[in-house]
Regions:
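C-terminal substrate-binding subdomain of Rossmann-fold SDR/epimerase-dehydratase oxidoreductases
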Residues: 2-6, 22-136
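Short, solvent-exposed loop/turn segments at secondary-structure boundaries
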Residues: 7-12
Length: 136
């Protein structure tokens, strides 16, 4: 999964949530590599912290997927962020990066059943938190 949330550097190579949020809030055009149909499982950082705490409370050595189980395309992400930030431009498209996965989504059923974890933040609420942090 792709973890996102406040304090993530918007100027790096990774962290598309922060990169896009930073650009859109500065009225800059985000660059999408490839056609934007590639999907990711975006999980809010506090959900990951919650999963780590719950997993530390067991003596079992567990291998768990921590994600939302929801696929969101890069195009969808830019569209949602654009609406939330009231940015009315169009993203720039660049050639896809070599080796990039087309789809990435995690099945979190074992985390739910073995440590009682499930994500509390939806993409919508997580993005609201991220935008709020960027606005400060």
């Amino acid at each position: 999964s792709n973890v996102y949330g406040p304090r993530q550097d918007p100027h790096g190579e990774a962290g598309v949530m922060s990169i896009f949020t930073g650009k859109l809030m500065n009225n800059e055009t985000p660059t999408i590599y490839g056609d934007g149909k590639q999907t990711r499982d975006y999980v809010y950082v506090l959900d990951v912290v919650d999963a780590l705490i719950k997993s530390s409370e067991t003596d079992d050595n567990l291998f768990l997927n921590i994600g939302t189980g929801v696929e969101t395309s890069v195009n969808e992400l830019v569209s949602i962020l654009s609406q939330k930030i009231s940015w009315d431009g169009e993203p720039e498209y660049a050639p896809k990066r070599e080796g990039e996965l087309l789809r990435s989504v995690l099945n979190n059923e074992r985390a739910m059943s073995q440590i009682g974890w499930e994500p509390k933040y939806t993409l919508d609420t997580g993005l609201d938190e991220l935008i709020s942090w960027f606005s400060k």
